Each structure stands twice: as structure tokens, then as C-alpha cells.
Amino acid sequence: MAELGRRVNLSAPAVGERVQRMEETGVITGYAAQVDPKAIGYPIAAVVRIRPARRQPHKVPEVARSTPEVVECHRVTGEDCYIAKVHLRSMDDLEGILDRFAVVGQTTTSIVHSAPVPPRPLPLVDEPEEG
């Protein structure tokens, strides 16, 4: 907390109290290390759009949760109901993942060429003053 306090011009106890309050209110939901997928053997990323078959939309999240290579899955508007981000060891691995989703719907896949805006934290804004 001392380093964080130095960065934001607050004492370590003040930072500790604020962090604890943010944890308790659900602003901070957890802590995680940022791992480079390439460094651990997953050099390929892909975005898979899934259009569920009739009466199958509830099964897409089940397939996504049971597929370890799926690192994100979002329900979206538009022609496709879900978008999943996957990390792959090889292109051969993609076929198996797509086969799992094919049971519940149609897929369209895009291979990620680069990430000009990598994952980043949201900007923090000050709370509006009451008055």
C-alpha cells in the first residue's frame, strides 16, 4: 500500500482503507496477474462469433465455460448472439474448438493479427460532488 500511496499522494493507511472499501462494495472484484499467452505457448488468438441454433442459446455459455481456451465470452446484439475470444497453441486446435460450438450453432471465426489496443484498465473518474 505504501507504493500505491506514494503514487496517489495518500498515506498507506488511507490507501488501505479505500482499497478495502472498494473491495467491500464490489468495485474491486479480484486480483490477477497479466500473463502473455504467447509466453506460455498460446501464440494464436481468434474471435469466434456464434449464432446459436433455435432453442440452443442457453447452451453456448456452457460450451464456452467448459472450453479452457475460451478466455472471454459475451452475449451481444446483432446477427450473432455471442462473441468468444480464444487463445490457441496451433491452428489445428481451432478445429476442435469450433467443433464444440458447432453442436449448438453456426460459427464465424477471425484470427487476431495484432492488438493495437491491448487490454487496459478503465479510466477512474471522480465521484460527482453532492450539492
Please annotate each region the language model reported.
Residues 1-131:
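A compositional/biophysical signature of low hydrophobicity enriched in polar/charged and small residues
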